[in-house]
UniProtKB/Swiss-Prot annotation:
Keywords noted in UniProt: Clathrin- and caveolin-independent endocytosis of virus by host, Clathrin-mediated endocytosis of virus by host, Disulfide bond, Fusion of virus membrane with host endosomal membrane, Fusion of virus membrane with host membrane, Glycoprotein, Hemagglutinin, Host cell membrane, Host membrane, Host-virus interaction, Lipoprotein, Membrane, Palmitate, Signal, Transmembrane, Transmembrane helix, Viral attachment to host cell, Viral envelope protein, Viral penetration into host cytoplasm, Virion, Virus endocytosis by host, Virus entry into host cell
Species whose genome carries this gene: Influenza A virus (strain A/Chicken/Hong Kong/96.1/2002 H5N1 genotype Y)
GO biological process, alphabetically ordered: clathrin-dependent endocytosis of virus by host cell; fusion of virus membrane with host endosome membrane; fusion of virus membrane with host plasma membrane; virion attachment to host cell
Top-level division of the source organism's lineage: Viruses
Subcellular location: Virion membrane; Host apical cell membrane
Gene Ontology cellular component list: host cell plasma membrane; membrane; viral envelope; virion membrane
Gene name in the database record: HA
Signal sequence region: 1-16
PTM comment text: Palmitoylated. In natural infection, inactive HA is matured into HA1 and HA2 outside the cell by one or more trypsin-like, arginine-specific endoprotease secreted by the bronchial epithelial cells. One identified protease that may be involved in this process is secreted in lungs by club cells.
Site feature location: Cleavage: 346-347
The protein's name in its UniProt record: Hemagglutinin
Xref: HAMAP family: INFV_HEMA
Length: 566
């Protein structure tokens, strides 16, 4: 009885003072994925995938876009009468064209190398329209009769504003020889065309000469065109067709024209006064009177995130497009509040998900810290040094990832003519392949970084635990749940010394040794008692078994079941 009382007294003494190492927990339900696990609940996380836009066309860095409304690029450059609002346009940040604009080539035909011209425009921010061959400078040809009902203006027949359709005059079409020398310091975009009549009668009616040609030459261009006379279906009321061409005339270079019919001469050209990043974006959106750094056909993106999944085509300083629906980067710890007692999977270091069973919602001023209890009370205290180092480390890592992924680029649609469909299909397959690879890389990066972040937190908790363990040594007992029981009295000053790393082991070692030996002695004495009882029990059992065997043998001998010889 005395031993039992002594044991209870010692147990109550040892249990009194404790210090535990733990980590922060909160009410967060946000989940992340790692290489090893899915749907890991964490205390803090950062979404790095932008999914929202404003649904508007905006200025890009303060520069308005050129929104062509119902006009196409061809209609704008040639001067479709329905596109007069774009006769002179200011600097633009990007060009917006509808998928099927109504005001294209009003007189039916083709625009040669149209896709290449659009690609050129993706590197231009401003044109200045200049007159190179005045309409009044054709005294031997009709320069005002070249109009068509296909290009109406105010209910009357008209024609493209920037070129002149030359017709015979007084039943004659003298051979044209005309040159223009580019004396500007800028490159010049020059446009001209040829008319393909419906039949020979129309050819004679308009140009008098049955066999005509157009020759165009520069230092880099040598072109000779002849009309293709053929019966065709009517488009916009016209059986004839027009084909338009363009070239870039360098400074101090000259363009020379020679023709005896079917010539659509340039009147205006475009001086390229500013080059820069631009794009031709297909979109049906309206202008939103807003400003952005990143524009997509779906709307503007204002985000510092490194990825987005809104549209693969962008202009400006944009996040990278990925096909993912979710990219969440862990910044905090595994969120396992103490009330949630079920065992979680272990992290690399086994700290948070291993020997420590749940976080503390009561510790709100740090990621890692302590909980102590002694005669003076109990309380939580964050380890601010390790917490700050962890915050700095995670913040630097997140910023580094964003910086690496934020290499700005533009992705604009490429257009191909009908003869290049196989190239277009190959290009789409290549772009889809690049997007698939980039999406995979982004998702893998997030999984790996989340694994590293959670292991980083596990390691920090384990390091804090080891810091305490190495200080206390045998002055305290490890309980296996992140806590230590002192073999000596540890007041608040003592607790504080453990937390800040100044614990004086020798000061408490003698008291701890005595208490430790006293507890060990009780255990040994109890062990001896148990051993004696075990021996007595074994001997008694053996004697009882021997007596039973002897009695059974005598009974069998007496009734003849067993022969007994002496």
């Amino acid at each position: 009885m005395e031993k039992i009382v002594l044991l209870l007294a010692i147990v109550s003494l040892v249990k009194s003072d404790q210090i535990c190492i733990g980590y922060h927990a909160n009410n967060s339900t946000v989940q992340v994925d790692t290489i090893m696990e899915k749907n890991v609940t964490v205390t803090h996380a950062q979404d790095i995938l932008e999914k929202t836009h404003n649904g508007k066309l905006c200025d890009l860095d303060g520069v308005k876009p050129l929104i062509l409304r119902d006009c196409s690029v061809a209609g704008w450059l040639l001067g479709n009468p329905m596109c007069d609002e774009f006769i002179n346009v200011p600097e633009w940040s990007y060009i917006v064209e509808k998928a099927s604009p109504a005001n294209d080539l009003c007189y039916p035909g083709d625009f040669n190398d149209y896709e290449e011209l659009k690609h050129l425009l993706s590197r231009i921010n401003h044109f200045e329209k200049i007159q190179i061959i005045p309409k009044s400078s054709w005294p031997n040809h009709e320069a005002s009769l070249g109009v068509s009902s296909a290009c109406p203006y105010l209910g009357k027949s008209s024609f493209f504003r920037n070129v002149v359709w030359l017709i015979k005059k007084n039943s004659a079409y003298p051979t044209i020889k005309r040159s223009y020398n580019n004396t500007n310091q800028e490159d010049l975009l020059v446009l001209w065309g040829i008319h393909h009549p419906n039949d020979a009668a129309e050819q004679i009616k308009l140009y008098q000469n049955p066999n005509t040609y157009i020759s165009v030459g520069t230092s880099t261009l040598n072109q000779r065109l002849v009309p293709k006379i053929a019966t065709r279906s009517k488009v916009n009321g016209q059986s004839g067709r027009m084909e338009f061409f363009w070239t870039i005339l360098k400074p101090n270079d000259a363009i020379n024209f020679e023709s005896n019919g079917n010539f659509i001469a340039p009147e205006y050209a475009y001086k390229i006064v500013k080059k820069g990043d631009s794009a031709i974006m297909k979109s049906e959106l309206e202008y939103g009177n807003c400003n952005t750094k990143c524009q997509t056909p779906m709307g503007a993106i204002n985000s510092s995130m490194p990825f987005h999944n809104i549209h693969p085509l962008t202009i400006g300083e944009c996040p990278k497009y990925v096909k993912s629906n979710r990219l969440v980067l862990a910044t905090g710890l595994r969120n396992t509040p103490q009330r949630e007692r079920r065992r979680k999977k272990r992290g690399l270091f086994g700290a948070i998900a291993g020997f420590i069973e749940g976080g503390w919602q009561g510790m709100v001023d740090g990621w890692y810290g302590y909980h102590h209890s002694n005669e003076q009370g109990s309380g939580y205290a964050a380890d601010k040094e390790s917490t700050q180092k962890a915050i700095d480390g995670v913040t630097n890592k997140v910023n580094s990832i964003i910086d690496k992924m934020n290499t700005q680029f533009e992705a604009v649609g490429r257009e191909f003519n009908n003869l290049e469909r196989r190239i277009e299909n190959l290009n789409k397959k290549m772009e889809d392949g690049f997007l698939d690879v980039w999406t995979y890389n982004a998702e893998l990066l997030v999984l790996m970084e989340n694994e590293r972040t959670l292991d980083f937190h596990d390691s920090n908790v384990k390091n804090l635990y080891d810091k305490v363990r190495l200080q206390l040594r045998d002055n305290a007992k490890e309980l296996g749940n992140g806590c230590f029981e002192f073999y000596h009295k540890c007041d608040d000053e003592c607790m504080e010394s453990v937390k800040n790393g100044t614990y004086d082991y020798p000061q408490y070692s003698e008291e701890a040794r005595l208490n430790r030996e006293e507890i060990s002695g009780v255990k040994l004495e109890s062990m001896g008692t148990y051993q004696i009882l075990s021996i007595y029990s074994t001997v008694a059992s053996s004697l009882a078994l021997a007596i039973m065997v002897a009695g059974l043998s005598l009974w069998m001998c007496s009734n003849g079941s067993l022969q007994c010889r002496i």
